[in-house]
Amino acid sequence: MLELRHRGGCPGPGGAGAPPPREGEAAGGDHETESTSDKETDIDDRYGDLDARGDSDVPEVPPSSDRTPEILKKALSGLSSRWKNWWIRGILTLTMISLFFLIIYMGSFMLMLLVLGIQVKCFHEIITIGYRVYHSYDLPWFRTLSWYFLLCVNYFFYGETVADYFATFVQREEQLQFLIRYHRFISFALYLAGFCMFVLSLVKKHYRLQFYMFAWTHVTLLITVTQSHLVIQNLFEGMIWFLVPISSVICNDITAYLFGFFFGRTPLIKLSPKKTWEGFIGGFFSTVIFGFIAAYVLSKYQYFVCPVEYRSDVNSFVTECEPSELFQLQNYSLPPFLQAVLSRETVSLYPFQIHSIALSTFASLIGPFGGFFASGFKRAFKIKDFANTIPGHGGIMDRFDCQYLMATFVHVYITSFIRGPNPSKVLQQLLVLQPEQQLNIYRTLKIHLTEKGILQPTLKV
């Protein structure tokens, strides 16, 4: 464990910044015998490594280079650093929003590819931090196994998605039928192979560090892959369940920044000193108003409200349906005090607008805690941003730290309060059954509908 003892850049056991010698250690000798090394390992196993003793032992990650385009640097060279950063963030934000609108126009399949691309980049940024922190140890197979586990977990989650939403397409392909039928076993076998490779890669002098990074990889997978899978599940419920939550988080991020930039005086949380109560409160009200208006606009169009379905006859995704009651105007009675102010007793709203208030409230009150969590993580490793992918913003993970928390909430919200039985999904499951099973279900359903009076009894001749 001697390598871990020197990780913070200490020159040696007696150098500046070195921890005091513990019981059983030589206090100043350069030569260590085999028995002394074994004794250190035993002490480390009982009391823990020096890693857990404080942030001072955590090595700093090398700072990222500035990727701001030269044309922007020249145009903003006369401004103070505060206003220069404001303009860079603003220009890049408008650029990203424009590209996002373009991808929305291109359809749900491109949105799914975007989510997968963001997932891979976020995983890369978090894993790279771990690799930079421990790069001097040359851990065997660390990066290879990390990407292998990413592949395995994606195969597990998205194989389930293919089985659920592409059943009619799978029926036409014999090879895919095998993969879908034994999907979970194949997923487990792939993961087990990676697990065995990890065990075989263990090296005595790096045991503890290798298990640290094994846990690091799995927590990263939990944060990125699981949440991106939930985002795509939300998208299949209808593009509106994807757009309103994501745009609410973006709106909160922008408006909280603007309110904090111009009016911020009172610090909000120590983890993120630049966050202020003024920005937090201003972002909350702005986000609720934005979400309510966005829900009204998007609820008018089938393209946004219909569940995303794969149609085998046209070999593409379609968003055509009769909108549910959630997206049909209804009259709501106003409270008495509003009736007096507005001189009307009722107001026409889409029911989804009521749900949008819950989504916007979560995005503005709880969503920022995803950002605070990320700030704590970055402080622990003494870094400013996860990466320097986007000038003025940092890495992709810096932009989506709140989105992952939002995705989980939306999925839980849909399954708890919105989703009912899906006839299309039930039909797809029926189509993959054996003919005898389909006939039994048909007879049972016919008897049930006849007993309820929906079907007329069949007269026997």
UniProtKB/Swiss-Prot annotation:
Q: What is its EC number?
A: 2.7.7.41
Membrane topology, from the record: Multi-pass membrane protein
What is the first-listed, main subcellular location in coarse terms?
endoplasmic reticulum
Please describe the organ and tissue distribution of this protein's expression: Expressed in adult brain, eye, smooth muscle and testis. Highly expressed in the inner segment of the photoreceptor layer of adult retina.
Q: Where are the transmembrane segments?
A: 96-116, 149-169, 183-203, 230-250, 279-299, 357-377
Query: Which UniProt key words apply to this protein?
Result: Endoplasmic reticulum, Lipid biosynthesis, Lipid metabolism, Magnesium, Membrane, Methylation, Nucleotidyltransferase, Phospholipid biosynthesis, Phospholipid metabolism, Phosphoprotein, Transferase, Transmembrane, Transmembrane helix
Q: Which GO terms describe its cellular component?
A: endoplasmic reticulum; endoplasmic reticulum membrane; membrane
* GO BP of this protein: CDP-diacylglycerol biosynthetic process; lipid droplet formation; phosphatidylinositol biosynthetic process; positive regulation of fat cell differentiation
Q: Which residues carry this modification: Omega-N-methylarginine?
A: 7
Q: Where found?
A: Endoplasmic reticulum membrane
Q: Where is the composition biased (Basic and acidic residues)?
A: 22-56
Quote the InterPro entries the UniProt record gives: PC_trans, PC_Trfase_euk
Region Disordered: which residues? 1-68
Cofactor requirement: Mg(2+)
Protein family (similarity comment): Belongs to the CDS family.
Q: What is this protein called?
A: Phosphatidate cytidylyltransferase 1
